[in-house]
Amino acid sequence: MHPIRCEAVVLATMDYRESDRIVTLFTLCHGKVRGLARGARKSMRRFGGALEPFARLSVELVVREGLSSLRGVDIVTVYPRIRQDLAAIGHGGYAVELVDRLLPDGASVPRLFRLLVSYLEHLDQGGASPSDRRFFEANLLNILGYRLSLDACAACGVEFPADAARRAGAAGTVLCTGCGRYGAPLSAETVRLLHRCLGTGRFGAIVFPPEPLGEAGPLLDGAIGAHLARPLNSLAFLRQLTP
């Protein structure tokens, strides 16, 4: 097979044998790919310091079912300011692990690739905020087909008037007050801000005040957790840094 050249973001790496490294890449043209970088741990000539999480690369690889072959890389950016700030490291590590865990191998999702790159660029410019994390999560769920259903009760199907009271149910569902009488309340402002997250493509444009942030967070956490077999490794560190 002939090698192809494609833009990619490094999601994860793992040492393999004495000198090799297995790299999980989110590529623009082939989706998530795991590639074997031969000699990456001993030789700096072919890969340099490029094979680190968050790095955005132009990669040359031979795509195969299972484990692809990574032939070479050119660095687009390693997002140096992310690596100098603990909050940015926490948010960036969470973002790439979340994409890795939710995206199946070989699924090409250009919109999600652009969302992740935009988030990493925003973090590199000092934008590590809880609001931007929730913006990223809401849009990621939407792109992958897990969009939050904010306008009708997940249990009985009744449509909500614009300012109707809502309750948060299990697994990120939204319920009417009759079906979700014991669920945490969701204010009209929280619902409005979540709708706005799905209507704008710009990080930093939406800021959740403390109360809506406290309501939106568990709802999004539940929606994401419903699609994960186990908790994210990066989440414990992120929770130490931010709400």
Curated annotation (Swiss-Prot):
Pfam families: RecO_C (PF02565), RecO_N (PF11967). It comes from the Bacteria. GO terms for cellular component: bacterial nucleoid. SUPFAM superfamilies: ArfGap/RecO-like zinc finger (SSF57863), Nucleic acid-binding proteins (SSF50249). One of its GO terms (biological process) is DNA recombination. InterPro entries: ARFGAP/RecO (IPR037278), DNA_rep/recomb_RecO_N (IPR022572), NA-bd_OB-fold (IPR012340), RecO (IPR003717), RecO_C (IPR042242). Keywords: DNA damage, DNA recombination, DNA repair. Involved in DNA repair and RecF pathway recombination. Belongs to the RecO family. This is DNA repair protein RecO. It comes from Geobacter sulfurreducens (strain ATCC 51573 / DSM 12127 / PCA).
